[in-house]
Amino acid sequence: LGMKYVEKSIISILGNTRFSQFNGLCVNDVGSLLYSDYKNGFNRQESAEMISEQLPSLTANMKLMTDTGNFCVIKNVSFISHLPTRASQSGSAYVSVPFLQLVLHGIVGYSSEPLNFSEDAKTSFLRCVEYGASPAYEWTYSRTHADGKTKSDENSAETIGVYYENWIASASAQYERADAALKDLQAARMTSHSEIRNGVFCTEYDTGAKIYVNYTESNVNISGITVPAGDFLRIN
C-alpha cells in the first residue's frame, strides 16, 4: 500500500465497518512492516509519521491490535501479537533481555511468538511467563502443508506442528497456568528483571509480586523458597 493511499484506506475501513457489531480491528502490516515510498515522496521516517497520524482515526470506537509492534503504532493499539522474546542475533556474545516488555507491560498487552513454531515449546512457554506475555499459538483446522496442500501423512512434522488437535489439550493447560500467574498483573508495571543465578530468573512488578523462572534441570532454593526444575513460581 502506497503511503499516499493510507488516509483513503482508513476512510474506507471506517465506512465499511460503520454498522458492524465488532469493537476491534487488527492492523497487522503496519505493525511489522515499515518501508519507504519514494515514488510518492515518502522516506521511512515520513512513512512512520503518516501511519502514526492516521491510526487514531480507527481508535475512536474500536480497539486495535497489531503484529510485532513497530513503535509508530504502539501508542494507538491495545494489544501486540508476536512481540519478540529473543535477541535478533544468536551466539554466545548475545543475551536476550525483556527490554520491550519492561517498557510496555502495564501499558499495552502482548503475546509471544507462536509456541508451536518453537523448537522447544516448554522453554518458550516459561519465557512467556518470565516476560509477562500471553502464550500464543497458530494452528490449522485441517491437516495441511504450510503451502495449504492437504497432507496425507498425519504424523509428519508439518502436520504435528500446526494441526490444532495435536496442541489444544496442552495449550489449554498452559493458558490456565499463565492466566493464574499473570492475569491480575496485566495493569502492573514491570520494575525489575534479573538472572539471580545461572538459568534462574526473577521478574518483579510494582504490586510487589515476583515470578521466578527456573530453566535448569534441578530444583533451586532461593531464600527458603523452592522453585521446581523446568518450572516457575509466583510469590506475592
Language model segments and positions:
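Active-site-proximal substrate-binding groove within the catalytic cores of carbohydrate-active enzymes
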Residues: 1-236
